[in-house]
Structure formats: C-alpha cells, structure tokens
C-alpha cells in the first residue's frame, strides 16, 4: 500500500477527510507502517491526544503537499533547503536504524556514503516504522552507543 495517502492529502477531499477522521486515519497508518506491532488503545490514545491540537491537520496536510511541491516551504528556511539539496556529507557520529520491513533499504547501504564520521547501521527485525515504541531498548541503546563514539 505504500505512501498512497500522500496523494490523497494533496486533494481538498484529503484535507477534509483527514480533518474529520484524523484518529481513525492515523490508526490505519500505524497499522500499515508497523503491521507486526500489536499496540493497545492506551498506547495509541497517548499519541492521539496530539491530533486534537488546532493546527495538527494544517501541519500534516502542508507537510505532505510540500513534499510533492504542491505547497511552498517557509521562505526563511530556503537557504537551509538549498544546502540540504546538495546532500552534504554528515560528519557527526551516527547510528542509523532500519527494519526488515524497509525492504531493500533495510541495510542502510543506500545512504551510508553520506556519513564521514564514525558510522554504523543497525537493522532491527520484526518491527515497522515506529522504532522508539516498537523496539525501545534497541533504540535507547543506539542513542547511548552513539554518545560513546
């Protein structure tokens, strides 16, 4: 199913649909992006409280439209955007994390050359895209380990 919803969000119908059904929609995306994660309602509800912020829908929709060049970015950050488009090498110590759910990108080789400092990549099996909640120990260990680099 991939990222189909980014195209839905590009439409006025997507904006209205997400605004009306943001909790159900988010739960669906959680299940799609992390199919093996058996989260309970309490876990979802803790995050879902943020969906009721008055600017939540506008921020989400703008983000997806901006990714598709359908909405402008913040002009005050244009200089940073230009620098990022050059794909600068990252010199700080880094640990990247992927999951076996990421398919060909899971092993990190596609972007490893972007790092010139001490670098390692960890592939976690059996999780989706919410590493901090699905694999909190492994995530925390990566933070601790990179601090020691």
Show which residues each predicted segment covers.
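Flexible "cap/lid" subdomain of the alpha/beta-hydrolase fold that forms the substrate-access gate
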Residues: 1-123, 144, 149
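Catalytic histidine-centered segment of alpha/beta-hydrolase-like enzymes
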Residues: 127-140
């Amino acid at each position: 199913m991939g990222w189909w919803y980014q195209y839905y969000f590009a439409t006025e119908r997507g904006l209205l649909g997400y605004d009306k059904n943001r909790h159900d929609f988010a739960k669906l995306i959680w299940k799609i992006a992390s199919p093996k994660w058996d989260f309970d309602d309490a876990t979802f509800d803790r995050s879902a409280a943020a969906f009721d912020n008055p600017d939540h829908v506008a921020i989400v929709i703008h983000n997806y439209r901006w990714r598709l060049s359908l909405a402008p970015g913040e002009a005050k950050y244009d200089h940073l955007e230009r620098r990022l488009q050059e794909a600068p090498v990252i010199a700080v110590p880094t640990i990247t994390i992927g999951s076996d759910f990421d398919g060909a990108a899971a092993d990190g080789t596609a972007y490893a050359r972007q790092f010139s400092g001490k670098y390692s990549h960890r592939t976690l099996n059996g999780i989706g895209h919410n590493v901090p909640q699905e694999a909190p120990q492994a995530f925390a260990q990566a933070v601790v380990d990179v601090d020691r680099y």
